[in-house]
Swiss-Prot record:
Gene name linked to the record: pyrI
PANTHER family: ASPARTATE CARBAMOYLTRANSFERASE REGULATORY CHAIN (PTHR35805:SF1)
Cellular component, GO, one term: aspartate carbamoyltransferase complex
Function in brief: Involved in allosteric regulation of aspartate carbamoyltransferase.
Cofactor: Zn(2+)
Species, as recorded: Methanocorpusculum labreanum (strain ATCC 43576 / DSM 4855 / Z)
NCBIfam families xref list: ATCase_reg
Single GO BP term: 'de novo' pyrimidine nucleobase biosynthetic process
Protein name: Aspartate carbamoyltransferase regulatory chain
One Pfam family linked to the record: PyrI
Amino acid sequence: MVRAISDGIVISPIKNGTVIDHITPGEGLTVLRILGIRDGTNVTVIVASNVPSSRGGRKDMVKIENRELLKDEVDKIALVAPDATISIIRNFKVSVKKPVEVPKQIIGVIKCPNPNCITNTKEPVQSRFVVHPRGFRCQYCDSLISCEMDIGDYI
């Protein structure tokens, strides 16, 4: 079963699984890495990169057959694609659709860029970041991962 969407792009629907839509252009492969999806997986994965968005501009999109995302996976995706939407598909129909939300505090997900931070030493301390107007700030050493940096490099 294949359907064409208005701009001429043909994308196969999935029977059951998850669609991650409105991913920041160029971050689709980062989303796959966050989800641990690698070459050789036996799961059907569809990636559309830099396609026109109904909201205007461009987007990436990922479809994953027979998998529903966990909350911590959605939280990680929100860091690289804050405007993304997650749709749960059941029997070819959208069962649940909701936007991702960037958590106010991110614990144990982001690696601090400061090599001297207590979270990067041999101490058993999880990283802890808070959302800052210019990016994400480490609560231990005050290092900033700015909006200009690629947050995907620190996940």
